[in-house]
Swiss-Prot record:
SUPFAM superfamilies: FAS1 domain (SSF82153). Its main location: other. Changing residue 197 to A: 50% reduction in catalytic activity. 50% reduction in catalytic activity. The record marks 172, 197 as: Required to bring heme into proper alignment for the reaction. It comes from Plasmodium falciparum (isolate 3D7). Disulfide bonds: none annotated. GO terms for cellular component: food vacuole; host cell cytoplasm; host cell cytosol. Component of the hemozoin formation complex (HFC) composed of falcipains FP2A and/or FP2B, plasmepsins PMII, PMIII/HAP and PMIV, heme detoxifying protein HDP and falcilysin FLN. The HFC complex is involved in hemoglobin degradation and detoxification of heme in the food vacuole during the asexual blood stage. Interacts with falcipain 2; the interaction is direct and enhances HDP catalytic activity. Interacts with host hemoglobin. Its EC number is 4.99.1.8. The gene is HDP. This is Heme ligase.
Length: 205
């Protein structure tokens, strides 16, 4: 009887120290409830890095990051992409940058105006997560209070249009999103001043 008393006391303390709950709460399998909890857990998590921090730290953006080291326009590009935004960027991976032949790349790097245009053509205003490009079906989000329709095009920082094309079905997980023919291969890298998606080809006008 005495052992039973101590057993109950220990169990009681365990429940008390586990979040202060003496009565364990029932677990739900309701998808909507789970989605809300996951949303609040991750959507509102603060992010300290900026887009510039991400460019210099991500292994898939090493070649692209070299463009920001340009002696003439590099500092102005860094300044612009460090502002509050929010921005949505579609930066080409190392493999994508290698699609540009050496001669063309050297011409691009040696022409400061073309270099600046090349970088800014990959950046748009506003905050577009991958799901928003497909059309958000859940609400409310952190920055928007209503459902967002999938855009037909986005306007970049140079006022050029990025045509959004969707292939496949989101619910079947066989979908792809293209911007001017460049496919998003790594989405939703959130930053303090926006979000970055990596694409498989440079966006060239």
């Amino acid at each position: 009887m005495k052992n039973r008393f101590y057993y109950n006391l220990i169990i009681k303390r365990l429940y008390t120290r586990s979040g202060g709950l003496r009565k364990p709460q029932k677990v739900t399998n309701d998808p909507e409830s789970i989605n809300r909890k996951v949303y609040w857990c991750f959507e509102h998590k603060p992010v300290k890095r900026t887009i510039i921090n991400l460019i210099y730290s991500h292994n898939e953006l090493k070649i692209f990051s070299n463009l920001l080291n340009h002696p003439t326009v590099g500092s102005s590009l860094i300044h612009e992409l460090s502002l509050d935004g929010p921005y949505t960027a579609f930066f080409p991976s190392n493999e994508a940058m290698q699609l540009i032949n050496i001669e063309s790349f050297n011409k691009l790097y040696n022409d400061e105006n073309k270099l600046s245009e090349f970088v800014l053509n990959h950046v748009t205003k506003e905050y577009w997560l991958y799901r928003d490009l497909y059309g958000s079906s859940y609400q409310p989000w952190l920055m928007y209070n209503e459902k967002r329709e999938a855009p037909e095009k986005l306007r970049n920082l140079l006022n050029n249009d990025l045509i959004v094309k969707i292939e496949g079905e989101f619910k079947h997980c066989n979908h792809s999103i293209y911007l001017n023919g460049s496919k998003i291969i790594r989405p939703n890298m959130k930053c303090h001043n926006g979000v970055v998606h990596i694409v498989d080809k440079p966006i060239i006008f």
